[in-house]
């Protein structure tokens, strides 16, 4: 919402800026609206501002003293001061604008007064010089200076006197001896008996407070009016009670809508919007409870509805700024112009998105290159198998091969028929993933599936129930490092099976 800027204080009234700042709220920086005071720290704020702040933090915004809403108290004096300040502000600004600039005559007249005073001081005594200067001031400035000097004398004699009584004393004292009274102002001040008599105090018959005699009439009027106000307040209705706080987490949507309907608020929107609407109503209602003449609930509801409409209008205007709008009657040329204007308007945003995409592409490219380099490493870089690993880590034989391809040695053949090529070579044994298949079986047998091997009885020799010696173990490791033909594979398998003996025969031997 657009708010008209307040006019600044002119240089001649710069002193008023301090008073202006003291009459403003420390939260909204506007003039106090239903001012309330925090008794713990004596800081003042608008009632609505401090209640909204306390809904988030229960402390003073200035000094962080712990405060709750029931601790707040009205400060009617600040409200009256704000009203007087707004009234005086317009008149002071108008007076400052309409008053003519200061003429140089006043400065020359002051110089003349100083010169005359110095000349008289050299020729005559001090009292006579003061009298001449007073006469000169009265002749130059007229009645205005005469009245101002009279007021100063009266303030020195009796500072508690009112303007009405001081005006009467001024006329009687100054009309008799105008020059002598003015000359006495510059000399030593000696209180007279007439002024001492005016300081006598009299007790008020209503409240019993001792009041100066010249103020007793005004005090009596205020006392009597105060008693009438008290009686009228007692007879009038009691102060409006504020609404209690609501725990929204425990309320269902149905109960929340029921509360809104109770005060005449709208029930449209989701739960968060309903909660926000109810909170605003409670804050404004409780703030008006502190006012001398609070607004009704219907007026507060109207204000909330107008605020929501203004907020929605602003949000819609912001959305329309970032959206291209077309109509059916627009030509292709007009549509292209809208597109070009949109591109020019959001060129910086487009460039920012392009830069972000390029940075992300560079990062992903580096990651993909590093992954490709890892996959292209040769197989020789893999760690070699340790020679002391057990035989179970060797690749196992496929069970789907035909039994005819596995030549078995007779059990009664001696073990000395082992081939000479099965010599242990335990240094630098290495293997690859494909060795486990090509070293033991020919390619035709791998391509053509065969019948599964039939089950054998327990008393016959099986490949699972074998005992490996150190010679056969070294032979197996040696075979993995060489490419062999199918015939050599059969011979190697035959030599390996020499060690295989049935358990019954092994026990007999």
UniProtKB/Swiss-Prot annotation:
It comes from the Eukaryota. Residues 248-282 form the SAP domain. A motif (LR motif) lies at residues 232-240. GO terms for cellular component: centrosome; chromatin; cytoplasm; male germ cell nucleus; nuclear inclusion body; nucleus; site of double-strand break; XY body. One of its GO terms (molecular function) is polyubiquitin modification-dependent protein binding. It is found in: Nucleus; Cytoplasm, Cytoskeleton, Microtubule organizing center, Centrosome. SMART domains: RING, SAP, ZnF_Rad18. Residues 365-401, 435-509 are annotated as: Disordered. The modification Phosphoserine is found at residues 99, 103, 158, 164, 485. GO terms for biological process: DNA damage response; negative regulation of DNA recombination; positive regulation of chromosome segregation; postreplication repair; protein autoubiquitination; protein monoubiquitination; response to UV; spermatogenesis. It catalyses: S-ubiquitinyl-[E2 ubiquitin-conjugating enzyme]-L-cysteine + [acceptor protein]-L-lysine = [E2 ubiquitin-conjugating enzyme]-L-cysteine + N(6)-ubiquitinyl-[acceptor protein]-L-lysine. InterPro entries: Rad18, Rad18_UBZ4, SAP_dom, SAP_dom_sf, Znf_RING, Znf_RING/FYVE/PHD, Znf_RING_CS. Expressed in thymus, spleen, brain, and ovary. The modification N-acetylmethionine is found at residue 1. Keywords: Acetylation, Cytoplasm, Cytoskeleton, DNA damage, DNA repair, DNA-binding, Metal-binding, Nucleus, Phosphoprotein, Transferase, Ubl conjugation pathway, Zinc, Zinc-finger. Its EC number is 2.3.2.27. It is an enzyme of class 2 (transferase). Residues 493-509 have a biased composition (Basic and acidic residues). Its main location: nucleus. A zinc finger (RING-type) spans 25-64. Zn(2+) binds at residues 204, 207, 219, 223. Pathway: Protein modification; protein ubiquitination. E3 ubiquitin-protein ligase involved in postreplication repair of UV-damaged DNA. Postreplication repair functions in gap-filling of a daughter strand on replication of damaged DNA. Associates to the E2 ubiquitin conjugating enzyme UBE2B to form the UBE2B-RAD18 ubiquitin ligase complex involved in mono-ubiquitination of DNA-associated PCNA on 'Lys-164'. Has ssDNA binding activity. Homodimer. Interacts with UBE2A and UBE2B, one homodimer binding one molecule of UBE2B. Interacts with HLTF. Interacts with SHPRH. Interacts with SPRTN; leading to enhance chromatin association of RAD18 and RAD18-mediated PCNA ubiquitination and translesion DNA synthesis. Interacts (via C-terminus and phosphorylated form) with SLF1 (via BRCT domains); this interaction is required for efficient repair of UV-induced DNA damage. Interacts with SLF2. Interacts with SMC5; this interaction is increased in a SLF1 or SLF2-dependent manner. Belongs to the RAD18 family. This is E3 ubiquitin-protein ligase RAD18. The lineage of its organism: Eukaryota, Metazoa, Chordata, Craniata, Vertebrata. The gene is Rad18.
């Amino acid at each position: 919402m657009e708010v008209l800027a307040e006019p600044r204080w002119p240089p001649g009234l710069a002193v008023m800026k301090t008073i202006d700042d003291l009459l403003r709220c420390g939260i909204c920086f506007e003039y106090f609206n239903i001012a309330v005071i925090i008794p713990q720290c004596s800081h003042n704020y608008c009632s609505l501002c401090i209640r909204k702040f306390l809904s988030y933090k229960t402390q003073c915004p200035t000094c962080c003293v712990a405060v709750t809403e029931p601790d707040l108290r009205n400060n009617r004096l600040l409200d009256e001061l704000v009203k007087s300040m707004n009234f005086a502000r317009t008149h002071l600004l108008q007076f400052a604008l309409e008053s003519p600039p200061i003429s140089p005559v006043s400065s020359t007249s002051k110089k003349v007064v100083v010169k005359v005073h110095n000349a008289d001081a050299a020729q005559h005594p001090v009292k006579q010089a003061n009298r001449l200067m007073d006469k000169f001031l009265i002749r130059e400035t007229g009645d205005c200076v005469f009245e101002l000097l009279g007021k100063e004398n009266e303030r020195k004699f009796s500072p508690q006197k009112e303007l009405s009584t001081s005006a009467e004393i001024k006329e009687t004292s100054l009309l008799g001896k105008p020059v002598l009274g003015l000359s006495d102002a510059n000399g030593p001040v000696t209180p007279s008996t007439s002024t001492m008599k005016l300081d006598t105090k009299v007790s008020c018959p209503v409240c019993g407070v001792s009041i100066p005699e010249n103020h007793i009439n005004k005090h009596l009027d205020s006392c009597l009016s105060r008693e009438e106000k008290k009686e009228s307040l007692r007879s009038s209705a009691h102060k409006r009670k504020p609404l209690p706080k609501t725990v929204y987490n425990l309320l269902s949507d149905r109960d929340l809508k029921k509360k809104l309907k109770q005060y005449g608020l709208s029930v449209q929107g989701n739960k968060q919007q309903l909660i926000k609407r109810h909170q605003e109503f409670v804050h404004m209602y409780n703030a008006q409870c502190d006012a001398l003449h609070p607004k009704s609930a219907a007026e507060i509801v109207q204000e909330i509805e107008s605020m929501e409409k203004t907020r929605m209008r602003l949000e819609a205007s912001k959305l329309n700024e970032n959206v291209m709008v077309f109509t059916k009657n627009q030509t292709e040329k007009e549509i292209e112009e809208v597109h070009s204007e949109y591109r020019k308007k959001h060129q910086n945003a487009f460039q920012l998105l392009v830069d972000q995409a390029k940075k992300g592409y560079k990062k992903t490219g580096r990651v993909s290159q590093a992954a490709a380099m890892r996959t292209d490493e040769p197989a020789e870089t893999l760690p070699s198998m340790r020679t002391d690993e057990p035989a179970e880590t060797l690749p196992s034989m496929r069970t789907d091969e035909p039994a005819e391809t596995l030549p078995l040695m007779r059990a009664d053949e001696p073990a000395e028929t082992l081939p000479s090529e099965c010599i242990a070579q335990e240094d630098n044994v290495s293997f690859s993933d494909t060795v486990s298949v090509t070293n033991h079986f020919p390619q035709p047998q791998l391509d053509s599936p065969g019948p599964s091997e039939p089950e054998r009885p327990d008393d016959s020799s099986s490949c699972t129930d074998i005992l490996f010696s150190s010679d056969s173990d070294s032979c197996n490791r040696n075979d993995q490092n060489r490419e062999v033909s199918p015939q050599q594979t059969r011979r190697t398998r035959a030599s390996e099976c020499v060690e295989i003996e049935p358990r019954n025969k092994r026990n007999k031997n």
